[in-house]
Amino acid sequence: MALEVSLSARMQAVADMVSEGNRVCDVGCDHGYVSIYLVQQKRVPGVLAMDINKGPLARAAEHVEQAGLSEYITLRRSDGLTAYEPGEAQTLICAGMGGRLMQKILEREPLKTESFQEMILQPQSELAVFRKFLRNRGYSITLEDMILEEGKFLKKQSGGIIVTVE
């Protein structure tokens, strides 16, 4: 039986923000559940799932295999966007890491960052600093979400921020 995934409220909010039909690059994919969910729900045609660490990438590979989605989800070891080539995806997901790390990932590869049509960003910390970074770079925050997880409302930014790249 193929692996069926269900997402936490936080990760569901991130997945729900992806524009239907876009190919996705998931940086820091961890276990690969968001990538698997997006393909299983036929929301996206494919995902490039990347992580810097071997362990999480190996877990993601197991999950993708169990889900029978190897032809739709490409796994790649990458420090941020270093292994990404512009044009491989229209949507960037960067979720579950600190705002400063996320800023570093986006700043280090500006041409790659600017190649995305949308970025779905879910910083876990340093929200004010990260929002200032986005503002200073001229990004438009086009959608935010507030979610209830584990009995607590998480700040709007915890649900995700969609940034329109212009």
Regions found by a protein language model. Name each.
Residues A2-L7, E88, R100-E166:
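Class I S-adenosyl-L-methionine
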Residues V5-G21:
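Conserved alpha-helix/loop element of class I SAM-dependent methyltransferases that forms part
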Residues G32, I36:
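Glycine-rich SAM-binding Motif I of class I
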Residues N53-G55:
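Conserved SAM/SAH-binding beta-strand->alpha-helix loop
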Residues A58-G87:
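S-adenosyl-L-methionine
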Residues E88-G96:
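Short SAM/SAH-binding signature in class I
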